[in-house]
């Protein structure tokens, strides 16, 4: 694997272990040329997924972009990294096992919203404000009212 520091084509694996509940392999690597240390993750990819954007343009699915969406919504929120990784892995697994190779971006957005709803209400509102293109305070009030009603119905969750 190419070293991210010096670009050398050779690196050595120093440690390998299961990650993400056995759905990935975490490898600790070292570059023999510059001594740089870095971590890589190896995951099973069932099929090559393409995302259909709102404009109709098709782009390859990017797991890291999905993870960044969660990280942005959950910034400064008390949610463990493991829970975020599990949510992302769950979405990826559902997408890959759906049988479809082309997936509308709206479908991914809905799955992210569902996952955030169970992770953190504030992150859910943050993501919904961008995903649903909120333009007025009333838009926020509606979503917050929905969350408040859910909490009143299911106080234990």
UniProtKB/Swiss-Prot annotation:
Any one GO biological process: negative regulation of DNA-templated transcription
Cofactor comment: Binds 1 zinc ion.
Cross-referenced InterPro entries: ATP-cone_dom (IPR005144), NrdR-like_N (IPR055173), RNR_NrdR-like (IPR003796)
Cofactors required: Zn(2+)
ZnF bounds (unnamed): 3-34
Domain ATP-cone, chain residue ranges per copy: 49-139
Region spans: Disordered: 1-21
Coiled coil residues, start to end: none
Keyword Transcription part of the UniProt annotation: yes
Disulfide bonding pattern of the chain: none
Biased composition (Basic and acidic residues): 11-21
Pfam families attached to this UniProt entry: ATP-cone, Zn_ribbon_NrdR
GO molecular function: ATP binding; DNA binding; zinc ion binding
Keywords: ATP-binding, DNA-binding, Metal-binding, Nucleotide-binding, Repressor, Transcription, Transcription regulation, Zinc, Zinc-finger
Function: Negatively regulates transcription of bacterial ribonucleotide reductase nrd genes and operons by binding to NrdR-boxes.
Family: Belongs to the NrdR family.
The protein, known as: Transcriptional repressor NrdR
Organism: Rhizobium meliloti (strain 1021) (Ensifer meliloti)
